[in-house]
Amino acid sequence: MTPPDDTGTGTRPARAPGTRRLTGHPLFWPAAVLAALLLGNVALTHDFLAVRVQNGHLYGSLVDILQFGAPLILVSLGMTLVIATRGIDLSVGSTVAIAGALACEHIATAADPGSLPTVFTAIVIALGVAAAIGLLNGFLVARLGVQPIVATLVLMVAGRGVAQLITDGQIISVSSPAYKMIGGGYWFTLPFAVLLAAALVAVTSLVTRRTALGMLIESVGGNPVASRLVGIRASGLLVTVYVVSALCAAVAGLMISSNVSSADGNNAGLWIELDAILAVVVGGTALTGGRFSLGGTVLGALIIQTLSTTIYTLGVPPETTLVFKALVVIVVCLVQSPAFRARFSRKSGGRGPVTPVPAPAADVTARRQEVHP
């Protein structure tokens, strides 16, 4: 009997294995959305992808996206590790503000603001305080059993107040070429912030994928009970990821403040924690913990930054910017949802899977006679 034709009536042509493998890759949809945003900007501004060399530095919209997206990439990097353990860190925005405020305050009051020792000391102070914030978050979550959203929400509010106390509610301006290098300098024609972010992403990826750390994080986030039964000490691991998250936020704060040569305790890092969570989710990491994707997080952060650039290019009114961003992010999340894609595919095809039709009774009888003459 001739087998049914897959392209006949009542059937949908099956996708090639290569296509299924490509679309099933966790980085496919974030990369596709990023490419669509870039192509949309090209349609609006034909020289959007143009990169030129001026005064020995690379300039262009793509370079701007990478440079201004570097702080968000770092914050999202630490947020990914926290979310992978079924946690959340809402204090990263305040940590960004505190780090920038401490560094600028130290440089502004130093005898030699432009010297390397002064800048180095400012960086150490900022990173040290950020590590203490991460330790406090980890202690509240791992040792005292406080819900992560509650523990970090406390420091989100208190940390913003600390940043305002450091700056006395004013904007602290500094003049230090060495400090400016962190967020606004160039090295080998590329923005130093981009190189620094790429290096930290590479190191984090190497540590989490080439050592047992990544497996332990996924184990604790995927099944805390089972990981505890096999002897994994989750408390120390949780403290570690919160410290890493705070340090990433501190470096982002140094980038932001050095790029503008000032610290604003009121607005620096404001709502960056929400953009970081969006970047992590858009990148394919589930808020329920477990498996995580650092590459997807980087793509998610670039999507958020490209979206912000697109909003300015379109001239969207400021009062509707957040609504516009939310709508686009919802679309991105739906596109990545396997259930949504399956439902959309069924509706667009117009036909569901074919139910096998039983062979007529006469054919069955004839076959039996052939087998048993």
Predicted features and spans:
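Transmembrane alpha-helical segments in multi-pass inner-membrane proteins
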Residues: A249, V260, D264-A326
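Single transmembrane alpha-helix segments in multi-pass membrane proteins
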Residues: N41-V42, L58-T109, F139-V146, V280, ...
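Helix-loop-helix "hairpin" substructures at the membrane interface of multi-pass membrane proteins
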Residues: T118-A126, I133-N137, L190-D264
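Inter-helical junctions in multi-pass inner-membrane proteins, predominant
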Residues: F48-D64, F68, A163-I166, T208-R209, ...
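Loop-to-transmembrane alpha-helix initiation sites
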Residues: L27, P148, T189-A197, L238, ...
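Alpha-helical transmembrane segments within multi-pass membrane transporters and channels
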Residues: P113-M156, G300
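Cytosolic-side transmembrane-helix boundaries in multi-pass membrane proteins
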Residues: M1-H46, A202, L229-G236, L307-P373
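Transmembrane helix-bundle core of multi-pass membrane transporters
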Residues: L144, P148-R210, L237-T240, N259-G269, ...
